[in-house]
Amino acid sequence: MAASVHCTLMSVVCNNKNHSARPKLPNSSLLPGFDVVVQAAATRFKKETTTTRATLTFDPPTTNSERAKQRKHTIDPSSPDFQPIPSFEECFPKSTKEHKEVVHEESGHVLKVPFRRVHLSGGEPAFDNYDTSGPQNVNAHIGLAKLRKEWIDRREKLGTPRYTQMYYAKQGIITEEMLYCATREKLDPEFVRSEVARGRAIIPSNKKHLELEPMIVGRKFLVKVNANIGNSAVASSIEEEVYKVQWATMWGADTIMDLSTGRHIHETREWILRNSAVPVGTVPIYQALEKVDGIAENLNWEVFRETLIEQAEQGVDYFTIHAGVLLRYIPLTAKRLTGIVSRGGSIHAKWCLAYHKENFAYEHWDDILDICNQYDVALSIGDGLRPGSIYDANDTAQFAELLTQGELTRRAWEKDVQVMNEGPGHVPMHKIPENMQKQLEWCNEAPFYTLGPLTTDIAPGYDHITSAIGAANIGALGTALLCYVTPKEHLGLPNRDDVKAGVIAYKIAAHAADLAKQHPHAQAWDDALSKARFEFRWMDQFALSLDPMTAMSFHDETLPADGAKVAHFCSMCGPKFCSMKITEDIRKYAEENGYGSAEEAIRQGMDAMSEEFNIAKKTISGEQHGEVGGEIYLPESYVKAAQK
């Protein structure tokens, strides 16, 4: 589709008038029609799922830790055959899942906020870490407990005109979600409220997603990671996608995007939402396109509106909508090396070219906002014209859309809708700062959400690395949410192993960014692991790592015996060449010889060498070279004498 858009560009008439003017949109009267649309959608999907045509096939497990079957198709979307993932205890040895209780003053609700406690040896205090793994040992057919039901019920009774976190924050109200996020981040709830009120942070939390454990996205908070999952027309199943959600969040994914484009889109999303404790985002244009049999020209506002309401009713926490792909911007991509690479962007662009009309998402932006502020669906304004290659980075088309994102952001804030802005893409490192600078300025410091960016195009199969480099860079500059890239990027649909690889790569990038921003928890985590490493507390080192399973398996490949877990060396250097063991020996020597500390031993050693240097003056140079100090260059005769 993107190719056909690219080929059609030269036929575009560029003298469009009045596109810069803000359209006059009628007041929305969406609410009376919501139930009708939802009922119609439910009826249609019920009919679609009555016929069974798929068969099951299996892939062999790719790791010892993943013995669950990887399904290619779903036989019965109403009752999938879910497979369990490895347990929390298997993934995180020496860790327990704990909860901190805090009381929401206004309601009296007791909130139980999760965290992961790593139990350390050697008298070291336990280390507490942010946890995204969600409730454990849950029957996926039943789904997670409805954590937020009482919170939502209480606020609904207040009869407020809007239901968004931004609305409450502007009123000076600290919601249960804000207190929950503040507790997770170890910050003052009032600070959370003020950042949400100013639009510098968002708490994606659809009032219909009752299973959600709230989290916050903003540049003054921990950098977060999003994991994309979803089926395609040729691969995956409901079982596999729910497994990916559970697996991604186990390893630290803070949000999930369901980008399904294949069969059972509605049912897949339903099962994901009922089993996800993290916010779930979508790109609604994908399902809208499926409703018109994949023909972009058959799309219209009514189909798109119906899809938005359907997904909001299910509990989707944020929508990616490419409303910044304007008709007049499409010709700007004509000379690109890779054209329009965004799926959503290309769909909107093709529709615009087919009718020579403005993007219907832009034209109906106020109507979209009216839907979002009734459910508290946050908007992730899509970057449909993002660069798809290093060659196209930071071009006119990309920044033209970003400027429009700023306009759409301010309009959303007027209706108390939470917003973040999506960013590139493929950008070399020296061009990354310009992206962050322009986004902060043009979008009034709304959270930035970037796909990487990939810093080079030469490494298919390793794009989780090429992009994590860019993600760490732009995260340190202020990007709040990093959309992961897996090793399969540009090659195929990622499986569960790819999902884990992508999440871990991006947790590294996010943590590196937190360190650069001098976040105190980030530094404490590094210090705890470094101390365990230096003291040869191998099990503590594994437990404190992002991926204990992999760290332990790599160590045990060459030193599998239990005794190796207490050895003061690894297979890299062996017992004689370990630098940390040598340093430990120096400290032990200093203590045994009464030097006190290693620092004192070093000081005394330097004093001794200084004295030896001064003695050299008396025995070699005498008055000929001055009365004080030794000589930098010793006479040849002295060297020969010393050698004898």
Swiss-Prot record:
Keyword annotations: 4Fe-4S, Chloroplast, Iron, Iron-sulfur, Lyase, Metal-binding, Plastid, S-adenosyl-L-methionine, Thiamine biosynthesis, Transit peptide, Zinc
InterPro entries xref list: ThiC (IPR037509), ThiC/Bza_core_dom (IPR038521), ThiC/BzaA/B (IPR002817)
Primary location: plastid
Tissues expressing this chain: Strongly expressed in cotyledons, leaves, flowers and siliques, and, to a lower extent, in roots. Expressed in all green tissues, but not in roots, seeds, and petals.
GO molecular function per UniProt: 4 iron, 4 sulfur cluster binding; carbon-carbon lyase activity; iron-sulfur cluster binding; metal ion binding; protein domain specific binding
Ligand binding (Zn(2+)): 426, 490
Any Pfam family hit: ThiC_Rad_SAM
GO BP, sorted A to Z: response to vitamin B1; thiamine biosynthetic process; thiamine diphosphate biosynthetic process
Catalytic function, reaction form: 5-amino-1-(5-phospho-beta-D-ribosyl)imidazole + S-adenosyl-L-methionine = 4-amino-2-methyl-5-(phosphooxymethyl)pyrimidine + CO + 5'-deoxyadenosine + formate + L-methionine + 3 H(+)
Gene Ontology cellular component annotations, sorted alphabetically: chloroplast; chloroplast stroma; plastid
PANTHER family in the cross-refs: PHOSPHOMETHYLPYRIMIDINE SYNTHASE, CHLOROPLASTIC (PTHR30557:SF1), THIAMINE BIOSYNTHESIS PROTEIN THIC (PTHR30557)
Quaternary context: Homodimer.
Family of the protein in this entry: Belongs to the ThiC family.
UniProt protein name: Phosphomethylpyrimidine synthase, chloroplastic
Species this protein is from: Arabidopsis thaliana (Mouse-ear cress)
Gene: THIC
